[in-house]
């Protein structure tokens, strides 16, 4: 029933998107964004990573690479926040040069607001600045399990702490300068701790307004430096109304922030279990959006086909906001490379193995089909 409601809701939005006077279906066009989101390489992997961008990713049509750096950079502004094996500025420059030569736009990421811990370990920011913790009374367990009485998934920093932005914005600026980046990805997914009652600064405040306030503050900071903000989109979807749930959408009322944040934020709309048709919702709200996938090849292929159809049928103003697709990788670089290389074996691994690399190969074939269809339609008859 929930699935039928979601499809009816999305179909109605889709029809609205297509309803322009005298509009005819547009010819298929290549996606403006054909991307991959992956962890930053370790210093020892930089040369291989640069060659991989040139020889493999560009050949597959990738033109956007979201690089999950977080604290794995040798920050000069806050050296106390360097990770264990940080990239140097020279190593980042090597990646930037390789990306530029391959026609790949690099977008660095630091998780802001949420994802400030993982299981039993605090993230670097809260290790060094525990006063930024939104929930200091929640102790990280020796052995993590979900569910748990504290509903602890990941810690958050308090968005109203007076000292937090001076620190994190220094990191953002330094990293963007090193990457010569036109855009920055702030994460902001799966934020479960926000506006907690016991927080002396934001307890009792509207969670949607808190989330929107943090998005807007980051966006305004980047805009003042001629950069744009990308974020994950799950906190902007109503998990109950849509039936999508509390992971790929929100159960803590942050979804209303969609009407409170600037429209020039780019939304990364991730769905991994099924191809929810939510990109059109974001596009109709005025946002540019990319559909994001993970480890189910058929789901990823369906997301590509759906987005192609949305772009083909939508009015021009909406079509230009449906930017494309991004394959996400949640292992380290080594893990993805192992999957990637295993698919070259004869015979290849069974279908239940190498699922992320298999999904990416399938999706990149799908967007090649889209480009071929567009080229064929352009031929004289």
Regions found by a protein language model. Give the residues of each.
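Aromatic-lined carbohydrate-binding surfaces of glycoside hydrolases
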Residues: 35-251, 257-261, 265
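Carbohydrate-binding surfaces of carbohydrate-active enzymes
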Residues: 355-381
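Catalytic-core regions of glycoside hydrolase
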Residues: 63, 178, 200-362
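N-terminal hydrophobic targeting/anchoring segments and the immediately downstream early-domain regions
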Residues: 24-55, 59-60, 64, 135-138, ...
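N-terminal secretory signal peptides that target proteins for export/translocation
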Residues: 1-5
């Amino acid at each position: 029933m929930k699935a039928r409601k979601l499809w009816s809701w999305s179909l109605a939005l889709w029809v609205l998107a297509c309803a322009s006077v005298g509009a005819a279906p547009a010819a298929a066009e290549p996606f403006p964004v054909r991307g991959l989101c992956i962890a930053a390489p370790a210093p020892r992997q930089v040369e291989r990573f640069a060659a991989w961008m040139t020889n493999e990713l560009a050949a597959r049509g990738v033109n956007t690479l979201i690089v999950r750096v977080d604290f794995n950079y040798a920050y000069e502004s806050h050296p106390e926040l360097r990770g264990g094996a940080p990239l140097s500025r020279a190593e980042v420059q090597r990646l930037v040069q390789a990306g530029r030569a391959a026609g790949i736009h690099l977008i660095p990421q630091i998780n802001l607001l949420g994802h400030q811990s993982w299981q039993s370990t605090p993230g670097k920011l809260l290790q060094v600045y525990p006063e930024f913790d939104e929930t200091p009374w929640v102790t990280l367990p020796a052995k993590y399990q979900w569910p748990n009485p504290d509903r602890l998934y990941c810690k958050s920093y308090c968005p109203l702490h007076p000292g937090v932005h001076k620190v994190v914005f220094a990191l953002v600026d330094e990293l963007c300068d090193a990457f010569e980046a036109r855009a920055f990805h702030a994460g902001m997914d799966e934020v479960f701790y926000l506006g907690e009652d016991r927080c002396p600064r934001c307890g009792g405040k509207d969670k949607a307004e808190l989330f929107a306030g943090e998005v807007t503050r980051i966006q305004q900071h980047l805009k003042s430096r001629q950069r744009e903000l990308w974020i994950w989109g799950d906190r902007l979807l109503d998990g109950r109304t849509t039936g999508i749930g509390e992971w790929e959408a929100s159960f803590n009322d942050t979804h209303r922030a969609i009407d409170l944040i600037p429209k020039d934020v780019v939304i990364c709309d991730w769905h991994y279990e099924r191809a929810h048709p939510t990109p059109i919702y974001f596009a109709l709200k005025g946002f540019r959006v990319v559909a994001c996938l993970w480890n189910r090849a058929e789901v990823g292929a369906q997301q590509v086909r759906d987005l192609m159809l949305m772009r083909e049928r939508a009015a021009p103003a909406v079509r230009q906001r449906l930017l494309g697709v991004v394959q996400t990788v949640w292992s380290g670089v080594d893990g993805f490379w192992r999957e990637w290389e295993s698919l070259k074996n004869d015979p290849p691994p069974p279908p239940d193995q190498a699922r992320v690399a298999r999904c990416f190969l399938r999706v990149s074939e799908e967007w090649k089909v889209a480009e071929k269809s567009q080229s064929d339609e352009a031929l004289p008859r």
